[in-house]
Amino acid sequence: MQQCNLAVDIGASSGRVIAGYLQNGKLQLEEVHRFDNKLIDLNNYFCWDIDRIYQEILMGIKSAVDNGYQPISLGIDTWAVDFVLLDENDMRLTDAVSYRDPRTDGMMEEVFSQISKERLYLETGIQFQKFNTMYQLQALKNSNPDLIEKATSFLMIPDYLNFLLTGKKVNEYTNATTTQLVNAFTKKWDIDLIEQLGFNSNMFMDIQPPESVIGNLRPELQEELGVDFNVILPATHDTGSAVVAVPEQENSIYISSGTWSLIGVENHFPICTTKALDYNFTNEGGADYRYRFLKNIMGLWMIQEVKRNFNDEFEFADFAAMAKGESFKSIVDVDDDRFLKPENMIEEIKAYCKETNQAIPQSPSEVAKCVFNSLAVSYQQAISQIEEIYEIDFPTIYVIGGGSKNEMLNQLIADTTGKTVIAGLSEATAIGNLIVQMMAIDQIDDMQQARQIIKHSFDLYTYAKVTMEG
């Protein structure tokens, strides 16, 4: 049997289990299981079907074994900010409510009435977004204060899945930083902040960094699955894992392109300046205790919703092809909250264009071009802000993640920014997840070797600005 490491990579719309192993100095990948991840309505909240997700992970492990693999480790990454609370008997007190649920409406303002925005940013360095864990906990405190008091464990989504696999409870560093409750400098829970907000500080676990080995599978799972291996912490925030896979960090900006677009640079220190606050940048934790100085903005969620509104009549590739030959010019502000979870994305786009006295898209190609144009303009604005903060011109943009396969958007980014775009690594998150596991068990020495392996294992494609003659 082929020994492998398993990356469980769960995004906001789908999850995969990917087997990875080194062969002749190259990283080989095989997807052994895939599943949809959709929100469900529980008790009038938009929630993740966390029990089903767990069962899908077990199915993925079985599938790997059925495909001739012998797993020696497993790591889980997911989206950020969402969590569950457990009681003293380790039973769930809360459902896995999604960041897309409107329960956090008005919660930022409520928190700011207790603690200043400036203090929050100076201490945590985290971008202000209404769905951050801090505001979810504030909403929960308002609606069910007894649940927070009863809670003995706060576990983010990957932490909880790790607990189900191993029986051990830890909070992983990269995802913990997205709560806006971790001190950017000490890298520990900000207990003063937590207690000032009236949250139960005893429910937070020790924060463990990527590469930490949690432990083996629970005995009953070993018996059920017929295998045992170490569960290891990658960067459990999917973007943290994706950034590990960026081949060059010097003089380059990355765009992790998926449901969300995360645009930034990697640092060895946080930037908690007034300008960074004004531009709403974040300092999320990264692997190797690095900082991901980035802005989290709208991504391909809009086109996913457009596809759904057209009753899945078109594939994603169809929208890119239609937009390529389209001259439609209208732009929407993709970061307007109205586009987070509208009843109908197409109608919301049309309404925005009408309200701003722009041409209203009618055909599928016009809607698609409007979305892609708007994303490219949003990227350009974020990149300009990064360069202003750093007082450096970054010549290169790495586009990684699922969106890197969109050649039309890659070219649009090059044309809009005037920079060289290097795209590839559509499986960047799984790659980064696997790389960290391999470093944890000494299959790879360090990040420098890891990035050399990545360079030699995967194809990258370069896009330059097209200059119109005449």
Curated annotation (Swiss-Prot):
- Listed GO biological process terms: glycerol metabolic process; rhamnose catabolic process
| Cited SUPFAM superfamilies | Actin-like ATPase domain (SSF53067)
Cystines in this chain: 353-370
* Cofactor(s) for this UniProt protein: Mg(2+)
Which residues hold substrate?
80, 237-239, 296
InterPro entries, per the entry: ATPase_NBD, Carb_kinase_FGGY, FGGY_C, FGGY_N, Rhamnulokinase
> What are its E.C. numbers?
2.7.1.5
Record's GO cellular component, any one?
cytosol
Q: Does the keyword Nucleotide-binding apply?
A: yes
Gene3D superfamilies assigned to the protein according to its UniProt record, in alphabetical order: 3.30.420.40
Name of the protein in question: Rhamnulokinase
